[in-house]
Regions:
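Short, surface-exposed amphipathic charged segments that create phosphate/polyanion-binding patches used
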Residues: 27-28, 70-73, 165-184
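Structural motif
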Residues: 37-38, 81-83, 132-138
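Short small-residue beta-strand/loop micro-motif enriched in glycine and branched aliphatics
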Residues: 97-101
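Accessory, usually C-terminal, subdomains that scaffold auxiliary metal cofactors
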Residues: 102-178
Length: 184
């Protein structure tokens, strides 16, 4: 929040994936930051048409909220949220939020490449104190790779079970997103 200036909005727009597309802003109060992002315009229009009073929350905000309880005031914490062929990777150093981005991840070598670049950019040598991860389906090679970056690996998953209507949705029952408040 200290660095954010309303008059600089045009400058922030230049860093977006599609500078010509409108960007959204959300405040993440516990981190005291303003986050800017873009979403799929057609998909968002579709959802707004179906649910005109709905409030849309970017997934990265939910990921950071769920990680919050695992972030100590001292030490380095790396977080990874796996989703199909991508991973959201975030970093906290001594309780301070430092980094969040989404990367295309096809193999554990891709995962290593991005993590090691983050380590290099933030001066992390060896291992972090803790690695958090969450996924509906995480390839075991990814989990094994994460173990090489910390002695403490924590899976963020739902603390209460969800009701499943069919066997296919059983895997989704452990998603930590189930713990978040729902619309009624």
């Amino acid at each position: 929040d200290d660095l954010y200036q309303e008059v600089d909005l045009d400058k922030y727009q230049e860093f977006m994936e599609n500078p010509a597309q409108e960007m959204n802003r959300t405040s993440i109060d516990f981190l005291q930051i303003q986050a800017f992002y873009q979403s799929d315009v057609l998909l968002q229009h579709r959802w707004k048409t179906l649910f005109p009073d709905a409030k849309f929350v970017p997934e990265f905000k939910l990921n950071l909220l769920q990680a919050r309880q695992f972030i100590p005031l001292k030490g380095d914490v790396l977080g990874v949220v796996f989703d199909d062929n991508s991973a959201d990777i975030y970093l906290f150093i001594n309780g301070q939020f430092k980094f969040y981005n989404t990367f295309e991840i096809v193999s554990d070598d891709d995962l290593s490449y991005f993590i090691l670049n983050i380590f290099d950019n933030f001066g992390i040598e060896g291992k972090v104190n803790k690695v958090l991860y969450s996924a509906i389906h995480a390839d075991q090679s990814f989990i094994q790779k994460l173990r090489t970056y910390s002695n403490e690996l924590i899976e963020i998953s739902a603390s209460k079970p969800a009701v499943s209507l069919d066997d296919e949705s059983e895997d989704y029952n452990k998603s930590y997103l189930i713990d978040l408040p729902t619309c009624e």
